[in-house]
A protein has these predicted regions:
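Beta-propeller-forming repeat regions
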Residues: 1-168
């Protein structure tokens, strides 16, 4: 109960803002899931939106490990880097994909307004340095105000994402 109104509020751990994945109101980060090369193995590809095109976050050498035809089709990084997912696999492959998206990366608190209504408030910028996997709500300094102790970091991310180790 962060605002002492007698209703339980919630801490929402999330991705944070210190990342290549930066969704905005008009442009979500999307994950396309499909057997793009029809080999019986399902692949997932993260994209950012540029106009009506979906640009892969996945680096060329990472994608060609999953889908070898990419190596034959795009010999140079400079050629691959100009392509959208639609260019690489075609509109039909994308329309047959399962698509998941996220458009809010901040860790936040969800304030209970009562009657089933909630308001989400992003935590301060310092709290967005890394993922939040756990949180403890307690009055750390005895001032009567609830504080949030966060736990995060992730070191096993793919190279195109980088390590998430900026919190302490």
């Amino acid at each position: 109960d962060f605002n002492n109104d007698g209703k339980p509020d919630f801490v929402l751990g999330n991705h944070g803002l210190n990342s290549r994945f930066k969704p905005t109101d008009g442009s979500a980060v999307r994950m396309f899931v499909n057997d793009f090369d029809q080999n019986g193995s399902v692949e997932q590809i993260y994209t950012k939106q540029s106009g009506d095109r979906h640009i892969p976050y996945t680096l060329k050498h990472e994608l060609e490990k999953q889908i070898p035809i990419v190596k034959k089709r795009y010999l140079k990084y400079s050629t691959y880097n100009k392509e959208s997912l639609e260019d690489i696999f075609g509109a039909e492959a994308l329309s047959n994909s399962v698509v998941q998206e996220f458009n809010f990366a901040s860790s936040a608190v969800m304030m209970n307004k009562g009657a089933g209504k909630f308001e989400i408030q992003a935590l301060p910028r310092k709290a967005q340095r890394s993922w939040m996997f756990a949180a403890l709500v307690t009055d750390v300094n005895g001032d009567g105000i609830q504080d949030i102790i966060m736990a995060g970091n992730l070191e096993g991310a793919k190279p195109e994402a980088g390590q998430y180790d900026a919190s302490y």
